[in-house]
């Protein structure tokens, strides 16, 4: 499974100044050294603002991804290549259409939505493509089926 666009953008922010707020309310602002796929962030030259308003300077900090409430990334990342419309082979015209288009494409691949008949031999006369008179190989049709023989 590939990583999503937000995580790709987070990786693009490595080496830039970001702001990170944790679920405890502390705000860390500094240079992002490394970001992992689970959003763990390693930062340097940090200015931390605590919930009560006090500030402190830290040299290095490592923040667990599940403890991050949100991140503020540089505006220059709006032009990152991940936000460009993807075109080309393999996309089949479903780029940016969401989960519904994916499910539709998968259903088409399984033979749904087409003309009736075909499939497991449940329709059509014997000898027709996909047809065996209603009896498939697994039901004792003309092609066998658990030792019962044909018709």
Curated annotation (Swiss-Prot):
Plays a role in pre-mRNA splicing as a core component of the spliceosomal U1, U2, U4 and U5 small nuclear ribonucleoproteins (snRNPs), the building blocks of the spliceosome. Residues 112-151 have a biased composition (Gly residues). Residues 108-113 are annotated as: 3 X 2 AA tandem repeats of R-G. Methylated on arginine residues by Art5 and Art7; methylation is not required for assembly and biogenesis of snRNPs. This is Small nuclear ribonucleoprotein Sm D3. The lineage of its organism: Eukaryota, Metazoa, Ecdysozoa, Arthropoda, Hexapoda. PANTHER family: SMALL NUCLEAR RIBONUCLEOPROTEIN SM. Belongs to the snRNP core protein family.
């Amino acid at each position: 499974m590939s990583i999503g666009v937000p995580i790709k953008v987070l990786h693009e922010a490595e080496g830039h100044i970001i702001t990170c707020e944790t679920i405890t309310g502390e705000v860390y602002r500094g240079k992002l050294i490394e970001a992992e796929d689970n959003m763990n962030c390693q930062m340097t030259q940090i200015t931390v603002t605590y919930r009560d308003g006090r500030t402190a300077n830290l040299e290095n900090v490592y923040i667990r991804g599940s403890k991050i409430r949100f991140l503020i990334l540089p505006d220059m990342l709006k032009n990152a290549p991940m936000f460009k419309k993807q075109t080309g082979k393999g996309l089949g015209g479903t780029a940016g259409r969401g989960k519904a288009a994916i499910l539709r494409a998968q259903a088409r691949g399984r033979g749904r939505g087409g003309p009736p008949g075909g499939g497991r031999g449940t329709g059509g006369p014997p000898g027709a493509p996909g047809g065996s008179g209603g009896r498939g190989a697994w039901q004792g049709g003309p092609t066998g089926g658990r030792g019962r023989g044909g018709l």
